[in-house]
């Protein structure tokens, strides 16, 4: 055997089976075998797909050609009470006579309609300040006594506290209200020229004026619907009818909950409607469920 043949034979043996003139595959070594096994395991492991981002559907006003850029998204309520529309129809039917105290003695009926606009607005605000924790009949009586003396910012500031107290008694918390009325009247004279503020934020900054009063003042005095005026009647009835997504503990919580779903065109009506309903039918104690058209629709009817 020649030296060349010997070298070829030795090289062929070192390459192993499959070597030769066409032999270009080597038997995989230990490292290659481990890599191949790892690749095989990867190929059989579950593939993790990237999560798809959730898409929110938004409705737009206008025609199809107007959808997209520049279109304003519609606000669609995510929750509303069950049967609320039928309940509202029934309450309107029960209130169609408009013979509750609020219908004749409420804020809309306490001011002098012949007085100048500025004076009318002041009288509206004053009647609201007196109405807190007070029946409509008592508030109306106090307003009549005040108007008989000429109810203006100047006349109130010229009236001593003792006399003012006698005029507004027996409204609830009359002593505190004497102080608040005097303080608020002084602010109106100094900063608003005897008129009342035209915004909720400025109204609630006045002594003795809360959110319910502010929203009613905006509606009655300025003709602007700024929010739902929620008193104890509206608060109680909204919770009994489950008109709030969860039970609320205060009128302000109730206002925020109602404004989330109740159509804005109903915001002003709902106060007088529910106040009268609460005065006549849905009473705080011993409500007259047997006479209520919503007895079968009211979640609280069975437990009262």
Curated annotation (Swiss-Prot):
APE1 displaces NTHL1 from the N-glycosylase-generated AP site in DNA, thereby increasing the turnover of the DNA N-glycosylase activity. AP lyase activity is stimulated by YBX1. ERCC5/XPG stimulates NTHL1 activity and NTHL1 binding to its DNA substrate. Its cofactor is [4Fe-4S] cluster. Residues 1-22 form a transit peptide. Its main location: nucleus. Its EC number is 3.2.2.-, 4.2.99.18. The active site is at 212 (nucleophile). The record marks 231 as: Important for catalytic activity. Widely expressed with highest levels in heart and lowest levels in lung and liver. Keywords: 4Fe-4S, DNA damage, DNA repair, Glycosidase, Hydrolase, Iron, Iron-sulfur, Lyase, Metal-binding, Mitochondrion, Nucleus, Phosphoprotein, Transit peptide, Ubl conjugation. CDD domains: ENDO3c. [4Fe-4S] cluster binds at residues 282, 289, 292, 298. It is found in: Nucleus; Mitochondrion. Bifunctional DNA N-glycosylase with associated apurinic/apyrimidinic (AP) lyase function that catalyzes the first step in base excision repair (BER), the primary repair pathway for the repair of oxidative DNA damage. The DNA N-glycosylase activity releases the damaged DNA base from DNA by cleaving the N-glycosidic bond, leaving an AP site. The AP-lyase activity cleaves the phosphodiester bond 3' to the AP site by a beta-elimination. Primarily recognizes and repairs oxidative base damage of pyrimidines. Also has 8-oxo-7,8-dihydroguanine (8-oxoG) DNA glycosylase activity. This is Endonuclease III-like protein 1.
